[in-house]
Amino acid sequence: LSEWRGQSAQIRIVDEVEASWGHIIADDFQLTDIRPNFLAWDQHERTFTVSKEHLVFPIHNLPETVERGFRDRKDWLEVKGSPVQLLFDGKTVRHYWARLAQNEQEVNWYASLSLEDFEGKEVTVRSWRSTEAGFDLIQQSNSIPGEEHFHKEAFRPKFHFTQKTGFNNDPNGMVYHDGIWHYFWQHNPMKKTMGNQTWGYATSTDLLHWIQHKGALFPYTNGDHYMFSGCGTVDKQNTAGFGENAIVLFFTNTSVGECIAYSNDGGKSFQRYENNPIITFDKHDTSGKPFHVGRDPKVIWYAYDAADTPLNETAAKFGGHWVMLVYDFTNGKENQSGRFYTSVDMKHWEHQSDLFGYFECMELFKLPVDGDETNPCWVIYSGDAKYAVGDFDGKTFTPEHEGKYRLHYGTYYASQTFDNAPSGRKIQVGWNTSQAAPEAPYAGHHSFPHELTLHQEAEGIRMRANPIEEIKELRVRSHHLENVEFTDSTPAILPLNSNTFDLTLEFEPGDTEQVILNIPGTHIRYKTKEQMIEHREIPLKLIDGKVKIRVLVDVCLYEIVGNDGRVYVSLPRDYKQKISEIKLEARGGTAKLTQLEVHELKSIWDYGPN
């Protein structure tokens, strides 16, 4: 403040957000001639011509207890870190918060931003509250420091996709286009906790082997315009005028509303729609756009059949219309709902209905019951994956039952399915919320892709989830054991020296109290009388006196599939526990193993014969 010494000044705190409840805490302002003992907001910047692929940033982790549980306001800057900006042509094109290492000894890992869009151009990197030594470690590079070890580390999954660095949460924008599976996710490239909402991006031709690309959507101003969750689809008929067969992403921009970005080059680049938002957060907007408060748009194409009445002549010409299902809390969280909008051009939307009792990260799709295309049913769910089945007429969803059903359990949240998948497949991926090892350069996991189907059960129509058939391509060695009785004192044992495998077990629990599948790093207990998996009391009924359990084990996590997909459970595993055998024990009686089949799986990052 030295340049204003002797002059009057005023500190003004302005809250311009009217959309939802909130408050600002601003206190303890002090004037002093003594520099405080924390890093001041001194600015460092460097202008350079882009000649390499990445701009890398030295990151220093805080202990997880501090990162996740700070309470003292003075710790806030320690947790949030420092603003970091990339500027091009005088404009901020990337804006993040990062906890930069203050010297080389403090570096835990390096974050990276792609410079591909600025090749040969002059850009400026700028940061505040960093030391000169720390800022000097921000450099151009053709690789990420430590990249030679990625996907080979002892703590990282081998057949579940993980981003190279940074944090992930919700899957986003999942779409199949011209032979390529496009997968996006909520990504914090600068930290191992949530924030800096960016859309990470990877593609695959087989749902197994993934190539990570530069991010697709970025925050670009200070503290707002974060790229929250959304979806992807293909505009086959060019209804929006973005181009035939364009990939179109819908996302929540936290400052303005629901927005669009599109690609005409197969996902190599995405352009934001110039008239964003298409649904506004500004209740004073006079453009005629719909207003709401919420997030996470899901957009699907609703194709007409003979019973449908088209929205208008344009919809009749195209043979259908677009439907947006979006989390809405315009009237408060106590009235949260899934809100349905319709459109013929993706740009202009009309509110049609609300389905109360649903919240963020919603999904809507149609599936045949027992594979019968003449007997389809609609499914709807939100972030917790609890779902309802019913009818949808293009405007309103009508559940055919009270309440919701549950398929997914454990560390599983915010799942999404691939739009436009071939043969009508519904391939689902969820955010596996289990954390990575403290020494890892990434945090968060993605579930293994699984296929959803509908089936007529005795209780009604229910959904199942099973790992995609493509997993068979990862098998390298197989082991079998069958027709073995086992007890507590005489367990059934299968020697196995692998931390990555696909196990299928069928057993008759008989008069036992419990059957225990003992895999080093985890125990799966089946309680016979209660007919449930003990962990979180997951129901799993006997079928003809038998239980079938499939387990995907992968270094630091595992997934349980019960009775051919009737339950799907995601859980963490202690990666330090090496597996040398699988053991089956029975408590309180004798059980019979009818079949145990184990397939060791190779890493999805092994492309060659070795």
What do these predicted ranges mean?
Residues 1-9, 14-21, 36-41, 58-60, ...:
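Extracellular carbohydrate recognition and processing domains
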Residues 134, 196-198, 256-261, 333-339, ...:
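Structural motif
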Residues 180-183, 240-249, 318-324, 372-379, ...:
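Entry beta-strands of beta-propeller and related beta-repeat scaffolds
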Residues 188-192, 254-256, 329-332, 435-436:
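Short glycine/acidic-enriched loop and turn motifs that connect beta-strands
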Residues 22-23, 33, 39-58, 63-90, ...:
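Beta-rich accessory regions
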Residues 35-39, 92-106, 135-172, 191-194, ...:
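Surface loop/turn signatures of beta-propeller and other carbohydrate-active proteins
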Residues 87, 204, 263-264, 340-343, ...:
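Conserved Ser/Thr-centered positions that define the repeating blades of beta-propeller domains
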Residues 19-27, 132-140:
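Edge beta-strands of jelly-roll/beta-sandwich modules across compartments, strongly enriched
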